[in-house]
Amino acid sequence: INPKTVLAWLIGAVGAPGALAGALVPIRESGSLIPQLLIGAWVRRHPVRKGFWALGAVIQGLCVLGMALAVWHWEGLAAGLAIVGLLVVFSLGRGFCSVAMKDVQGKCIPKSRRGRLTGLASTLSGLATLAVGLVLFGQDSEPGLLFYTLLLVAAGLAWWLAAAVFASVDEYQGETAGGGHALREAL
């Protein structure tokens, strides 16, 4: 969910005050990075970390589905505040994914294949974006609220599918020592 484009557009589409759109990027970025300072050491104490990524993906999917409900059922300030509030929780889930991803990838994907994996993921997401773009711009009229709500539902379900796939990864136990509590060390 891109806060600069998708969510900013959604804020306007539901008739929420435009000032809410200005808060989206800082919320997503700080809402993901700051909690990592708190949870990083705790996650590293667990030898198998794929569950944290899966949990983060489930949280993100739930938030995107919540945004779909907000867009469909509310308008104005209520819908805008719901989107912003759900983005806060979404960002916390994103933080779990960020903390766990590199460790799991480092243990499960050979170094020589990591670039290919990232490239494949980028290619598939680009093709999906292209398909949605063709649907959007291939019509004579602007798609309605139902179309955008269904896109959010599809995105939420995709997060849940990703959580299930990631949870099935055969991750071996890793190192649990080292890496202090980042917030304490920063202060």
Mark where each language-model region is.
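Helix-loop boundary and gating motifs at the non-cytosolic
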Residues: 1-34, 39, 43, 50-60, ...
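Transmembrane alpha-helix termini and helix-breaking/packing motifs in multi-pass membrane transporters
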Residues: 8-16, 40-46, 68-74, 126-152
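Alpha-helical transmembrane segments of multi-pass secondary-active solute transporters
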Residues: 21, 52, 117, 148-154
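Glycine-rich segments within core transmembrane alpha-helices of 12-TM secondary carriers
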Residues: 29-36, 63, 118-137
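Hydrophobic core of transmembrane alpha-helices in multi-pass small-molecule transporters
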Residues: 63-70, 77-97
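Cytoplasmic helix-loop-helix junction between adjacent transmembrane helices
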Residues: 88-123
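C-terminal membrane-cytosol helix-exit motif in multi-pass small-molecule transporters
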Residues: 93, 136-137, 156-175
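Juxtamembrane intracellular "pre-TM" segments in multi-pass secondary transporters
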Residues: 171-187
